[in-house]
């Protein structure tokens, strides 16, 4: 925009640069979606009639009518990401900066975002994306910059980026440059009565219709069961119920054939949440591991080293990056010693190497006899990590 950043007031920069953060909740100012879309425009002093028109145009072009007139706290993680992008889009900035914009989006939402970013380019907008999930950028990117330790190490043209050899991609810790097709092997037979059994389950939130209705499946020891589906279909609601964070309205949940009440599920299940900020409470990384129930100092240090957190023992968890927080939460799950381990988008914001480490970790937990469930939209991760995938609202894959 021709403005020297150091000499320009933040409020002036904000008129030209729109930012979508990795954690969309950190940029929300209202409780309802309509007000959130209007907020930025109101701050710019846009007349009310123009605000109404811009919001209507945003909703129509981004196809987010289903997000309107809703409480933001009722949105899924992916829906919050879409709302954050829409709130910036409504302000019509010249420059867009997006931090991990697809981290919690399903395939359909990623495709919508990709098309919208192409449109922004055609309109002459500048788009800067910090991203680990790369496949959706294939026909979008003009230049790719590789950063290590805060410095630009490599710069690729579009042709160079897309022609990168796999060995070079892996060496740099980059994700696949092409979309992964799920192709799971035929699931093996499991012993009846074993595992976590869900029968006719119905669950949801107070004063709202059940999100999950009449759902039945079994997660067995020794396997990694993936759970996927569109944003807002009820994946997080389901696993919160399995862990005893919300009550079931219908049906039953059993472990090894014994029906578990809510408090019993809390004792037997450990959940790594989609937004790990909700479960990091200690004033140090080491203390967080102790709080998870681990008492063996050597075991804690071994787990932290495994997840590249060995140098951060005394660091406050809130001072970690998004990916580091994610790895810390996964480490606490491993150290908890519970029978059922459930991960909600565990590879969100992770590069190739750390994604492969989480993949190996969940596979090893399954081999150790744990019951492992993983909610994810990350096809590259699910292909390598999961034995079966339960597609909510669709036919199960690998069955």
Question: What label would you give each PLM region?
Answer:
Residues 228-230:
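The feature captures the beta-strand-to-loop junction immediately N-terminal to the Walker
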Residues 96-99, 341-344:
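Catalytic Walker B motif of ABC-type/P-loop ATPase nucleotide-binding domains
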Residues 1-12, 252-265:
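ABC ATPase NBD Q-loop/coupling interface
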Residues 243:
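Helix-to-loop junction immediately C-terminal to a conserved catalytic motif
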Residues 131-132, 376-377:
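H-loop/switch region of ABC-family ATPase nucleotide-binding domains
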Residues 50-67, 297-312:
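Conserved ABC ATPase "signature" region
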Residues 71-75, 79, 316-320, 324:
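Conserved ABC ATPase signature
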């Amino acid at each position: 925009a021709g403005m020297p950043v150091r000499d320009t007031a933040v409020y002036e920069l904000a008129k030209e640069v729109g930012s979508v953060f990795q954690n969309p909740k950190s940029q929300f100012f209202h409780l309802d979606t309509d007000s959130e879309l209007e907020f930025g425009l109101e701050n710019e002093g846009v007349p009310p009639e123009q605000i109404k028109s811009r919001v209507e145009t945003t909703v129509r072009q981004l196809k987010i009518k289903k997000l309107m007139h809703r409480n933001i706290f009722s949105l899924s993680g992916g829906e919050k990401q879409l709302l954050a992008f829409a709130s910036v889009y409504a302000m019509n900035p010249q420059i867009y900066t997006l931090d991990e914009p697809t981290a919690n989006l399903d395939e359909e939402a990623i495709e919508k975002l990709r098309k919208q970013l192409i449109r922004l380019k055609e309109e002459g907008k500048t788009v800067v994306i910090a991203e680990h999930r790369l496949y959706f950028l294939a026909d979008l990117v003009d230049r790719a910059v590789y950063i290590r330790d805060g410095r630009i190490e490599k710069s690729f043209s579009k042709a160079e980026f897309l022609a990168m050899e796999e060995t070079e991609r892996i060496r740099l810790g980059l994700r696949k440059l092409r979309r992964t097709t799920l192709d799971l092997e035929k699931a093996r037979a499991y012993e009846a009565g074993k595992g976590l059994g869900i029968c006719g389950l119905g669950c949801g939130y107070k004063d709202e219709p059940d999100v999950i209705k009449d759902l039945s499946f079994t997660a067995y020891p020794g396997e990694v069961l993936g759970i996927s589906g569109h944003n807002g279909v009820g994946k997080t609601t389901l696993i919160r119920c399995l862990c005893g964070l919300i009550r079931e309205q219908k049906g039953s949940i059993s472990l090894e054939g014994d029906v578990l009440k809510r408090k019993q599920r809390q004792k037997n299940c450990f959940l790594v949440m989609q937004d790990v900020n909700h479960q990091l409470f200690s004033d140090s990384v080491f203390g967080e591991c102790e709080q998870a129930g681990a008492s063996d100092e050597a075991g804690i240090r071994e787990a932290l080293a495994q997840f590249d957190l060995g140098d951060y023992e005394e660091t406050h968890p809130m001072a970690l990056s998004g990916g580091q927080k994610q790895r810390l939460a996964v480490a606490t799950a491993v150290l908890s010693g519970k029978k059922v381990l459930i991960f909600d988008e565990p590879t969100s914001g992770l590069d190739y190497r750390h994604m492969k480490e989480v993949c190996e970790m969940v596979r090893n937990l399954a081999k150790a006899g744990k019951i492992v469930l993983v909610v994810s939209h990350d096809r590259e991760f699910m292909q390598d990590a999961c034995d079966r995938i339960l597609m909510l609202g669709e036919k199960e894959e690998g069955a």
